[in-house]
């Protein structure tokens, strides 16, 4: 069995922003942005988070803007 998938159907991910009625993603809302950044500091892709394409673009801009303003780190801190 070389790399076959097991199990049934996966649950469809729902966009966090459309389900909560959020229309504007603010770059100063660091707690919200941290949910969409990995522990290494990378922006999580749509297939992981389930966000729609529209909000993924807005989210990416907000995270990059937040990094430029030094609110979010570019990379994770070493332990």
Curated annotation (Swiss-Prot):
**One annotated Gene Ontology cellular component of this protein:** cytosolic small ribosomal subunit
Q: What molecular function terms (GO) are annotated for this protein?
A: small ribosomal subunit rRNA binding; structural constituent of ribosome
Q: Name one GO biological process term.
A: translation
The protein's matches in InterPro entries, at most eight in alphabetical order, are given as: Ribosomal_bS18, Ribosomal_bS18_CS, Ribosomal_bS18_sf
Q: Which PROSITE patterns does the annotation name?
A: RIBOSOMAL_S18
* Keywords, sorted A to Z: Ribonucleoprotein, Ribosomal protein, RNA-binding, rRNA-binding
Assembly with partners or alone = Part of the 30S ribosomal subunit. Forms a tight heterodimer with protein bS6.
**Physiological role:** Binds as a heterodimer with protein bS6 to the central domain of the 16S rRNA, where it helps stabilize the platform of the 30S subunit.
User: Member of which family?
Assistant: Belongs to the bacterial ribosomal protein bS18 family.
Provide the protein name: Small ribosomal subunit protein bS18
Species per Swiss-Prot/TrEMBL record: Listeria monocytogenes serovar 1/2a (strain ATCC BAA-679 / EGD-e)
Gene for this chain: rpsR
